[in-house]
Amino acid sequence: MPSRVEKGGASKYHQKNAETGKLFARERIAKLVDAGSFVEDAALANNLDADLPADGVVTGTAKVDGRTVCIMANDSTVKAGSWGRRTVEKILRIQETARDLRAPLFYLVDSAGARITDQIEMFPGRRGAGRIFYNQVQLSGQIPQICLLFGPSAAGGAYIPAFCDVVVMVDGNASMYLGSPRMAEMVIGEKVTLEEMGGAKMHCSVSGCGDVLCKTEDDAIAWARRYLGYLPERTGEPPPDAPAKAPKSSGKRIEEIVPADENKSFDMMAVIHEIVDEGSWCEIKQLFAREILTGFARIEGKVVGVVANQPKWLGGVLFVDSADKAARFIWLCDAFEIPLLYLADVPGFMIGTKVERQGIIRAGAKMIAAVSEATVPKISVVVRKAYGAGLYAMCGPAFEPDACLALGSASIAVMGPQAAVNAVYYNKIQEVPAGPERDAYVAKLRDEYRADIDLMKLAAELVIDAVVPGDRLRGELAARFARFAAKDERRLKKKHIVPPV
Protein backbone atom coordinates (compact mmCIF):
# COMPACT_ATOMS: atom_id res chain seq x y z
CA MET A 1 0.00 0.00 0.00
CA PRO A 2 1.43 3.44 -0.90
CA SER A 3 2.56 5.32 2.21
CA ARG A 4 0.45 8.33 1.25
CA VAL A 5 -2.66 6.19 1.59
CA GLU A 6 -1.63 5.01 5.05
CA LYS A 7 -0.89 8.58 6.13
CA GLY A 8 -4.34 9.86 5.24
CA GLY A 9 -4.85 13.58 4.69
CA ALA A 10 -2.53 16.54 5.04
CA SER A 11 -0.47 16.95 8.21
CA LYS A 12 -2.36 20.10 9.21
CA TYR A 13 -5.53 18.04 9.60
CA HIS A 14 -3.72 15.49 11.74
CA GLN A 15 -2.43 18.33 13.89
CA LYS A 16 -5.93 19.78 14.24
CA ASN A 17 -7.26 16.42 15.38
CA ALA A 18 -4.45 16.00 17.90
CA GLU A 19 -5.22 19.39 19.42
CA THR A 20 -8.76 18.26 20.22
CA GLY A 21 -7.85 14.81 21.51
CA LYS A 22 -8.87 12.98 18.35
CA LEU A 23 -6.95 10.01 17.00
CA PHE A 24 -6.26 9.19 13.36
CA ALA A 25 -8.74 6.66 11.93
CA ARG A 26 -6.06 3.99 11.57
CA GLU A 27 -4.92 4.55 15.17
CA ARG A 28 -8.49 4.02 16.33
CA ILE A 29 -8.66 0.73 14.49
CA ALA A 30 -5.30 -0.38 15.92
CA LYS A 31 -6.53 0.30 19.47
CA LEU A 32 -9.84 -1.48 18.88
CA VAL A 33 -8.64 -4.73 17.32
CA ASP A 34 -6.25 -7.49 18.31
CA ALA A 35 -2.67 -6.60 17.35
CA GLY A 36 -1.82 -7.32 13.72
CA SER A 37 -5.26 -8.70 12.89
CA PHE A 38 -6.63 -5.95 10.63
CA VAL A 39 -6.95 -6.81 6.93
CA GLU A 40 -7.91 -3.78 4.88
CA ASP A 41 -10.18 -3.72 1.85
CA ALA A 42 -10.05 -1.26 -1.06
CA ALA A 43 -7.23 0.84 0.36
CA LEU A 44 -6.53 2.15 -3.14
CA ALA A 45 -10.02 3.51 -3.73
CA ASN A 46 -9.82 6.79 -5.65
CA ASN A 47 -6.01 6.51 -5.59
CA LEU A 48 -5.63 8.61 -8.74
CA ASP A 49 -6.66 11.65 -6.71
CA ALA A 50 -3.82 12.52 -4.34
CA ASP A 51 -6.20 14.49 -2.10
CA LEU A 52 -8.49 11.51 -1.44
CA PRO A 53 -6.47 8.62 0.04
CA ALA A 54 -8.75 5.57 0.47
CA ASP A 55 -11.55 8.01 -0.43
CA GLY A 56 -11.80 9.05 3.19
CA VAL A 57 -12.88 5.75 4.75
CA VAL A 58 -10.96 2.72 6.01
CA THR A 59 -12.75 -0.64 5.84
CA GLY A 60 -11.75 -4.21 6.55
CA THR A 61 -11.93 -7.23 8.82
CA ALA A 62 -10.11 -7.95 12.07
CA LYS A 63 -10.25 -9.81 15.37
CA VAL A 64 -11.46 -8.44 18.71
CA ASP A 65 -10.64 -10.80 21.56
CA GLY A 66 -10.24 -13.51 18.95
CA ARG A 67 -13.64 -12.88 17.33
CA THR A 68 -13.95 -11.87 13.68
CA VAL A 69 -15.39 -8.38 13.22
CA CYS A 70 -15.90 -5.95 10.36
CA ILE A 71 -14.93 -2.28 10.58
CA MET A 72 -15.75 0.98 8.85
CA ALA A 73 -13.79 4.05 9.98
CA ASN A 74 -14.21 7.55 8.57
CA ASP A 75 -10.92 9.39 8.05
CA SER A 76 -11.58 12.97 9.12
CA THR A 77 -8.21 14.10 7.71
CA VAL A 78 -9.60 13.51 4.20
CA LYS A 79 -12.24 16.06 3.27
CA ALA A 80 -13.48 16.00 6.90
CA GLY A 81 -14.45 12.35 6.48
CA SER A 82 -17.10 13.25 3.92
CA TRP A 83 -18.67 10.70 1.60
CA GLY A 84 -18.00 10.36 -2.11
CA ARG A 85 -19.19 7.64 -4.48
CA ARG A 86 -16.38 5.24 -3.62
CA THR A 87 -16.72 5.99 0.09
CA VAL A 88 -20.30 4.82 -0.06
CA GLU A 89 -19.40 1.76 -2.12
CA LYS A 90 -16.75 0.76 0.42
CA ILE A 91 -19.23 1.07 3.28
CA LEU A 92 -21.79 -1.00 1.38
CA ARG A 93 -19.24 -3.70 0.68
CA ILE A 94 -18.11 -4.03 4.30
CA GLN A 95 -21.76 -4.27 5.32
CA GLU A 96 -22.20 -7.07 2.81
CA THR A 97 -19.06 -8.74 4.14
CA ALA A 98 -20.47 -8.55 7.68
CA ARG A 99 -23.69 -10.09 6.39
CA ASP A 100 -21.87 -12.94 4.65
CA LEU A 101 -19.55 -13.63 7.60
CA ARG A 102 -22.35 -13.00 10.10
CA ALA A 103 -19.81 -10.95 12.02
CA PRO A 104 -20.27 -7.90 14.27
CA LEU A 105 -19.84 -4.58 12.50
CA PHE A 106 -18.17 -1.53 14.05
CA TYR A 107 -18.86 1.93 12.64
CA LEU A 108 -16.14 4.39 13.70
CA VAL A 109 -17.88 7.60 12.72
CA ASP A 110 -16.27 11.01 12.22
CA SER A 111 -17.80 12.55 9.12
CA ALA A 112 -19.10 15.84 7.79
CA GLY A 113 -21.62 13.98 5.62
CA ALA A 114 -22.02 13.91 1.86
CA ARG A 115 -19.70 15.68 -0.57
CA ILE A 116 -22.05 18.00 -2.37
CA THR A 117 -19.71 17.92 -5.37
CA ASP A 118 -20.33 14.16 -5.69
CA GLN A 119 -24.03 14.10 -4.91
CA ILE A 120 -25.25 12.69 -8.23
CA GLU A 121 -22.82 9.77 -8.00
CA MET A 122 -23.25 8.98 -4.28
CA PHE A 123 -26.69 10.12 -3.20
CA PRO A 124 -29.78 9.00 -5.12
CA GLY A 125 -29.05 5.68 -6.86
CA ARG A 126 -29.54 2.02 -5.99
CA ARG A 127 -25.97 1.85 -4.65
CA GLY A 128 -26.19 5.34 -3.18
CA ALA A 129 -25.94 6.49 0.43
CA GLY A 130 -29.49 5.45 1.24
CA ARG A 131 -28.47 1.82 0.71
CA ILE A 132 -26.23 2.09 3.79
CA PHE A 133 -29.27 2.64 6.00
CA TYR A 134 -31.26 -0.04 4.18
CA ASN A 135 -28.46 -2.49 4.89
CA GLN A 136 -28.32 -1.47 8.54
CA VAL A 137 -32.00 -2.28 8.94
CA GLN A 138 -31.56 -5.64 7.22
CA LEU A 139 -28.60 -6.46 9.49
CA SER A 140 -30.39 -5.31 12.64
CA GLY A 141 -31.01 -8.23 14.97
CA GLN A 142 -28.82 -10.48 12.80
CA ILE A 143 -25.38 -9.21 13.84
CA PRO A 144 -24.28 -6.67 16.46
CA GLN A 145 -23.85 -3.17 15.01
CA ILE A 146 -21.79 -0.88 17.23
CA CYS A 147 -21.19 2.83 16.61
CA LEU A 148 -18.30 4.74 18.13
CA LEU A 149 -18.96 8.40 17.45
CA PHE A 150 -15.68 10.31 17.62
CA GLY A 151 -16.65 13.46 15.74
CA PRO A 152 -19.61 14.77 13.77
CA SER A 153 -22.25 12.66 12.09
CA ALA A 154 -24.06 15.24 10.06
CA ALA A 155 -27.24 15.44 8.00
CA GLY A 156 -28.28 12.07 6.55
CA GLY A 157 -25.13 10.53 7.99
CA ALA A 158 -26.70 10.91 11.44
CA TYR A 159 -28.79 7.86 10.65
CA ILE A 160 -25.75 5.55 10.85
CA PRO A 161 -25.63 5.84 14.65
CA ALA A 162 -29.42 5.89 14.83
CA PHE A 163 -29.65 2.43 13.24
CA CYS A 164 -26.90 0.87 15.37
CA ASP A 165 -27.57 -1.26 18.45
CA VAL A 166 -25.48 1.00 20.66
CA VAL A 167 -23.91 4.45 20.24
CA VAL A 168 -20.80 5.43 22.21
CA MET A 169 -20.08 9.18 22.11
CA VAL A 170 -16.91 11.06 23.09
CA ASP A 171 -17.66 14.13 25.15
CA GLY A 172 -16.64 17.41 23.55
CA ASN A 173 -16.02 16.00 20.07
CA ALA A 174 -18.91 13.73 19.10
CA SER A 175 -22.08 15.23 17.66
CA MET A 176 -24.96 14.26 15.44
CA TYR A 177 -27.58 16.45 13.86
CA LEU A 178 -29.69 16.70 10.73
CA GLY A 179 -29.00 20.40 10.31
CA SER A 180 -25.98 22.30 11.60
CA PRO A 181 -26.31 25.37 13.86
CA ARG A 182 -25.48 27.55 10.86
CA MET A 183 -28.23 25.92 8.80
CA ALA A 184 -30.70 26.23 11.68
CA GLU A 185 -30.02 29.95 11.90
CA MET A 186 -30.39 30.40 8.13
CA VAL A 187 -33.54 28.31 7.71
CA ILE A 188 -35.55 28.73 10.91
CA GLY A 189 -33.82 31.66 12.60
CA GLU A 190 -32.66 29.64 15.61
CA LYS A 191 -29.32 30.56 17.16
CA VAL A 192 -27.85 27.56 18.92
CA THR A 193 -24.45 26.09 19.74
CA LEU A 194 -23.23 22.79 18.34
CA GLU A 195 -23.40 21.19 21.81
CA GLU A 196 -26.99 22.38 22.26
CA MET A 197 -27.97 21.18 18.80
CA GLY A 198 -26.43 17.74 18.83
CA GLY A 199 -23.58 17.37 21.29
CA ALA A 200 -22.66 14.19 23.09
CA LYS A 201 -24.00 15.22 26.50
CA MET A 202 -27.30 16.33 25.02
CA HIS A 203 -27.84 13.12 23.07
CA CYS A 204 -26.81 10.88 25.98
CA SER A 205 -28.99 12.65 28.56
CA VAL A 206 -31.86 14.37 26.72
CA SER A 207 -32.67 12.84 23.32
CA GLY A 208 -31.53 9.30 24.12
CA CYS A 209 -29.83 8.95 20.72
CA GLY A 210 -26.54 8.29 22.51
CA ASP A 211 -26.11 5.32 24.85
CA VAL A 212 -22.75 5.88 26.52
CA LEU A 213 -20.81 9.10 27.19
CA CYS A 214 -17.03 8.71 27.39
CA LYS A 215 -14.38 11.26 28.30
CA THR A 216 -11.77 10.09 25.80
CA GLU A 217 -11.48 8.02 22.65
CA ASP A 218 -9.50 5.39 24.56
CA ASP A 219 -12.38 5.09 27.03
CA ALA A 220 -14.87 4.71 24.18
CA ILE A 221 -12.81 1.99 22.49
CA ALA A 222 -12.34 0.10 25.76
CA TRP A 223 -16.08 0.26 26.46
CA ALA A 224 -16.91 -1.05 22.99
CA ARG A 225 -14.56 -4.00 23.39
CA ARG A 226 -16.15 -4.80 26.75
CA TYR A 227 -19.68 -4.48 25.35
CA LEU A 228 -18.92 -6.97 22.59
CA GLY A 229 -17.98 -9.52 25.24
CA TYR A 230 -21.63 -9.76 26.35
CA LEU A 231 -22.97 -10.49 22.87
CA PRO A 232 -22.96 -13.59 20.69
CA GLU A 233 -21.29 -13.23 17.32
CA ARG A 234 -24.66 -13.51 15.65
CA THR A 235 -28.30 -14.15 16.39
CA GLY A 236 -29.27 -17.71 17.24
CA GLU A 237 -26.14 -18.35 19.30
CA PRO A 238 -25.84 -18.04 23.09
CA PRO A 239 -23.87 -15.15 24.57
CA PRO A 240 -20.35 -16.04 25.74
CA ASP A 241 -19.81 -17.26 29.30
CA ALA A 242 -17.14 -15.99 31.67
CA PRO A 243 -15.67 -17.37 34.90
CA ALA A 244 -18.16 -16.89 37.73
CA LYS A 245 -17.40 -14.31 40.41
CA ALA A 246 -19.06 -13.65 43.73
CA PRO A 247 -20.98 -10.37 44.03
CA LYS A 248 -19.30 -7.33 45.52
CA SER A 249 -21.49 -7.24 48.60
CA SER A 250 -22.00 -4.11 50.66
CA GLY A 251 -22.31 -6.24 53.76
CA LYS A 252 -26.01 -5.43 54.01
CA ARG A 253 -28.81 -7.88 53.41
CA ILE A 254 -31.16 -6.96 50.56
CA GLU A 255 -33.95 -6.61 53.13
CA GLU A 256 -31.82 -3.92 54.82
CA ILE A 257 -31.22 -2.09 51.54
CA VAL A 258 -34.91 -1.96 50.58
CA PRO A 259 -36.98 0.14 53.03
CA ALA A 260 -40.24 -1.40 54.18
CA ASP A 261 -41.91 2.00 53.74
CA GLU A 262 -42.74 2.09 50.03
CA ASN A 263 -42.59 5.89 50.02
CA LYS A 264 -38.89 5.92 50.97
CA SER A 265 -36.40 5.90 48.13
CA PHE A 266 -33.37 3.65 47.81
CA ASP A 267 -30.73 2.90 45.20
CA MET A 268 -31.67 -0.16 43.13
CA MET A 269 -28.03 -0.39 42.06
CA ALA A 270 -27.25 -1.60 45.58
CA VAL A 271 -29.65 -4.52 45.03
CA ILE A 272 -28.16 -5.27 41.61
CA HIS A 273 -24.65 -5.44 43.06
CA GLU A 274 -25.84 -7.99 45.65
CA ILE A 275 -27.07 -10.23 42.81
CA VAL A 276 -24.61 -10.01 39.91
CA ASP A 277 -20.99 -11.09 39.54
CA GLU A 278 -18.51 -8.49 40.74
CA GLY A 279 -17.41 -6.11 37.99
CA SER A 280 -19.91 -7.45 35.47
CA TRP A 281 -22.41 -4.58 35.42
CA CYS A 282 -22.36 -2.80 32.03
CA GLU A 283 -24.94 -0.03 32.00
CA ILE A 284 -26.55 1.34 28.85
CA LYS A 285 -28.17 4.79 28.68
CA GLN A 286 -27.02 5.62 32.21
CA LEU A 287 -27.66 9.36 31.80
CA PHE A 288 -31.02 9.06 30.03
CA ALA A 289 -34.37 8.38 31.74
CA ARG A 290 -32.61 7.56 34.99
CA GLU A 291 -35.80 6.33 36.65
CA ILE A 292 -35.15 3.00 34.96
CA LEU A 293 -31.90 1.04 34.76
CA THR A 294 -30.85 -1.05 31.77
CA GLY A 295 -27.63 -2.97 31.36
CA PHE A 296 -25.84 -6.27 30.95
CA ALA A 297 -24.44 -8.28 33.84
CA ARG A 298 -23.47 -11.84 34.70
CA ILE A 299 -24.87 -14.22 37.27
CA GLU A 300 -22.53 -17.17 37.88
CA GLY A 301 -20.73 -16.22 34.67
CA LYS A 302 -23.89 -16.24 32.52
CA VAL A 303 -24.98 -13.06 30.71
CA VAL A 304 -28.32 -11.48 31.61
CA GLY A 305 -29.97 -8.23 30.58
CA VAL A 306 -31.32 -6.29 33.55
CA VAL A 307 -34.33 -3.96 33.46
CA ALA A 308 -34.82 -2.38 36.88
CA ASN A 309 -36.90 0.46 38.25
CA GLN A 310 -34.81 3.07 40.08
CA PRO A 311 -36.72 4.53 43.06
CA LYS A 312 -33.84 6.94 43.62
CA TRP A 313 -34.97 8.91 40.55
CA LEU A 314 -38.54 10.20 40.31
CA GLY A 315 -39.69 7.38 42.56
CA GLY A 316 -39.20 4.85 39.77
CA VAL A 317 -42.33 6.08 37.98
CA LEU A 318 -42.40 5.19 34.29
CA PHE A 319 -42.36 8.12 31.85
CA VAL A 320 -42.30 8.30 28.04
CA ASP A 321 -38.51 8.25 27.90
CA SER A 322 -38.11 5.42 30.40
CA ALA A 323 -40.61 3.28 28.50
CA ASP A 324 -38.76 3.95 25.24
CA LYS A 325 -35.42 3.17 26.89
CA ALA A 326 -36.64 -0.11 28.33
CA ALA A 327 -38.39 -1.23 25.13
CA ARG A 328 -35.29 -0.78 23.00
CA PHE A 329 -33.12 -2.63 25.50
CA ILE A 330 -35.58 -5.52 25.73
CA TRP A 331 -35.63 -5.82 21.94
CA LEU A 332 -31.81 -5.80 21.92
CA CYS A 333 -31.61 -8.62 24.46
CA ASP A 334 -34.28 -10.68 22.74
CA ALA A 335 -32.55 -10.30 19.37
CA PHE A 336 -29.28 -11.69 20.71
CA GLU A 337 -30.52 -14.49 22.98
CA ILE A 338 -29.74 -12.65 26.23
CA PRO A 339 -32.01 -13.70 29.13
CA LEU A 340 -33.93 -10.90 30.83
CA LEU A 341 -34.15 -10.12 34.54
CA TYR A 342 -36.77 -7.58 35.65
CA LEU A 343 -36.41 -5.98 39.10
CA ALA A 344 -39.65 -4.18 39.91
CA ASP A 345 -40.33 -1.38 42.33
CA VAL A 346 -42.79 0.64 40.30
CA PRO A 347 -45.76 2.78 41.32
CA GLY A 348 -46.99 2.79 37.71
CA PHE A 349 -46.91 5.11 34.73
CA MET A 350 -46.89 8.88 35.15
CA ILE A 351 -50.21 10.69 34.75
CA GLY A 352 -51.18 14.24 33.79
CA THR A 353 -51.71 16.38 30.73
CA LYS A 354 -47.99 16.84 30.05
CA VAL A 355 -47.26 13.13 29.63
CA GLU A 356 -50.55 12.46 27.84
CA ARG A 357 -49.56 15.01 25.21
CA GLN A 358 -46.13 13.40 24.97
CA GLY A 359 -47.77 10.04 24.25
CA ILE A 360 -47.44 8.13 27.52
CA ILE A 361 -50.06 5.59 26.39
CA ARG A 362 -48.20 4.96 23.14
CA ALA A 363 -44.84 4.71 24.92
CA GLY A 364 -46.24 2.41 27.59
CA ALA A 365 -47.77 0.20 24.92
CA LYS A 366 -44.40 0.05 23.19
CA MET A 367 -42.69 -1.17 26.36
CA ILE A 368 -45.42 -3.71 27.04
CA ALA A 369 -45.20 -4.87 23.41
CA ALA A 370 -41.46 -5.43 23.78
CA VAL A 371 -42.03 -7.40 27.00
CA SER A 372 -44.71 -9.47 25.27
CA GLU A 373 -42.60 -10.23 22.21
CA ALA A 374 -39.49 -11.42 24.04
CA THR A 375 -39.03 -15.19 23.91
CA VAL A 376 -35.70 -15.46 25.74
CA PRO A 377 -35.69 -16.79 29.31
CA LYS A 378 -37.13 -14.07 31.54
CA ILE A 379 -37.63 -13.77 35.27
CA SER A 380 -39.39 -10.96 37.09
CA VAL A 381 -38.73 -10.11 40.72
CA VAL A 382 -41.03 -7.81 42.67
CA VAL A 383 -38.49 -6.15 44.93
CA ARG A 384 -40.96 -3.93 46.77
CA LYS A 385 -44.06 -2.97 44.80
CA ALA A 386 -45.61 -3.35 41.36
CA TYR A 387 -48.75 -1.31 40.86
CA GLY A 388 -51.12 -0.88 37.95
CA ALA A 389 -49.77 -1.15 34.43
CA GLY A 390 -46.30 -0.94 35.95
CA LEU A 391 -46.72 -4.64 36.79
CA TYR A 392 -47.41 -5.36 33.12
CA ALA A 393 -44.45 -3.29 31.92
CA MET A 394 -42.11 -5.13 34.29
CA CYS A 395 -43.10 -8.57 32.96
CA GLY A 396 -45.81 -9.45 35.46
CA PRO A 397 -47.44 -12.90 35.57
CA ALA A 398 -49.65 -12.33 32.51
CA PHE A 399 -46.60 -11.78 30.28
CA GLU A 400 -45.22 -15.31 30.55
CA PRO A 401 -42.16 -14.85 32.71
CA ASP A 402 -40.51 -18.19 33.34
CA ALA A 403 -40.85 -17.27 36.99
CA CYS A 404 -42.40 -14.39 38.90
CA LEU A 405 -40.59 -14.08 42.23
CA ALA A 406 -41.02 -11.69 45.13
CA LEU A 407 -39.14 -10.58 48.19
CA GLY A 408 -41.02 -10.97 51.44
CA SER A 409 -42.02 -7.30 51.64
CA ALA A 410 -43.37 -7.13 48.08
CA SER A 411 -46.78 -5.75 47.19
CA ILE A 412 -48.80 -6.21 43.98
CA ALA A 413 -52.01 -4.30 43.35
CA VAL A 414 -53.92 -2.04 40.99
CA MET A 415 -52.69 0.84 43.13
CA GLY A 416 -51.08 1.45 46.50
CA PRO A 417 -53.08 1.57 49.76
CA GLN A 418 -53.09 5.34 50.06
CA ALA A 419 -54.29 5.97 46.51
CA ALA A 420 -56.79 3.10 46.60
CA VAL A 421 -58.44 4.19 49.84
CA ASN A 422 -58.74 7.77 48.62
CA ALA A 423 -60.19 6.63 45.30
CA VAL A 424 -62.76 4.22 46.72
CA TYR A 425 -63.73 5.82 50.02
CA TYR A 426 -63.23 9.54 49.41
CA ASN A 427 -66.85 10.52 50.07
CA LYS A 428 -67.11 8.40 53.21
CA ILE A 429 -63.81 9.79 54.49
CA GLN A 430 -65.14 13.33 54.09
CA GLU A 431 -68.16 12.44 56.24
CA VAL A 432 -65.89 11.65 59.20
CA PRO A 433 -64.85 14.69 61.26
CA ALA A 434 -61.33 15.84 60.48
CA GLY A 435 -58.75 15.00 63.10
CA PRO A 436 -57.88 11.84 65.05
CA GLU A 437 -61.19 10.15 64.21
CA ARG A 438 -60.69 10.55 60.46
CA ASP A 439 -57.04 9.52 60.71
CA ALA A 440 -58.00 6.33 62.54
CA TYR A 441 -60.71 5.56 60.00
CA VAL A 442 -58.32 6.01 57.07
CA ALA A 443 -55.67 3.86 58.79
CA LYS A 444 -58.24 1.10 59.31
CA LEU A 445 -59.23 1.18 55.62
CA ARG A 446 -55.60 1.00 54.55
CA ASP A 447 -54.94 -1.98 56.81
CA GLU A 448 -57.95 -3.75 55.32
CA TYR A 449 -56.66 -3.02 51.81
CA ARG A 450 -53.21 -4.35 52.68
CA ALA A 451 -54.77 -7.55 54.02
CA ASP A 452 -56.64 -7.98 50.74
CA ILE A 453 -53.43 -7.82 48.70
CA ASP A 454 -51.34 -9.85 51.14
CA LEU A 455 -48.37 -11.50 49.43
CA MET A 456 -49.12 -14.94 50.86
CA LYS A 457 -52.61 -14.70 49.43
CA LEU A 458 -51.12 -13.94 45.99
CA ALA A 459 -48.77 -16.89 46.34
CA ALA A 460 -51.69 -19.11 47.32
CA GLU A 461 -53.48 -18.02 44.15
CA LEU A 462 -50.36 -18.85 42.06
CA VAL A 463 -49.78 -15.21 41.10
CA ILE A 464 -46.30 -15.44 42.61
CA ASP A 465 -44.17 -18.52 41.95
CA ALA A 466 -41.95 -18.12 45.00
CA VAL A 467 -41.28 -15.74 47.87
CA VAL A 468 -37.51 -15.61 48.15
CA PRO A 469 -35.36 -14.23 50.99
CA GLY A 470 -32.83 -11.67 49.76
CA ASP A 471 -29.82 -13.81 50.66
CA ARG A 472 -31.14 -16.62 48.45
CA LEU A 473 -32.17 -14.49 45.47
CA ARG A 474 -28.94 -14.78 43.47
CA GLY A 475 -28.86 -18.57 43.81
CA GLU A 476 -32.54 -18.83 42.92
CA LEU A 477 -32.03 -16.72 39.80
CA ALA A 478 -28.96 -18.70 38.70
CA ALA A 479 -30.80 -22.00 39.09
CA ARG A 480 -33.91 -20.84 37.27
CA PHE A 481 -32.03 -19.22 34.38
CA ALA A 482 -30.02 -22.44 33.96
CA ARG A 483 -33.26 -24.43 33.96
CA PHE A 484 -34.80 -22.35 31.17
CA ALA A 485 -31.68 -21.85 29.04
CA ALA A 486 -32.85 -24.42 26.50
CA LYS A 487 -36.55 -23.54 26.41
CA ASP A 488 -38.34 -23.56 23.06
CA GLU A 489 -39.26 -20.22 21.56
CA ARG A 490 -42.92 -19.89 20.71
CA ARG A 491 -43.97 -17.26 18.21
CA LEU A 492 -47.11 -16.99 16.16
CA LYS A 493 -46.31 -17.13 12.47
CA LYS A 494 -46.45 -13.57 11.15
CA LYS A 495 -44.16 -10.98 9.61
CA HIS A 496 -44.07 -8.63 12.60
CA ILE A 497 -46.30 -6.78 15.02
CA VAL A 498 -47.67 -3.34 14.20
CA PRO A 499 -45.65 -1.53 16.85
CA PRO A 500 -47.14 1.33 18.89
CA VAL A 501 -44.31 3.78 18.19
Question: What annotation goes with each model-predicted range?
Answer:
Residues 1-501:
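Ligand-binding clefts of soluble mixed alpha/beta catalytic domains
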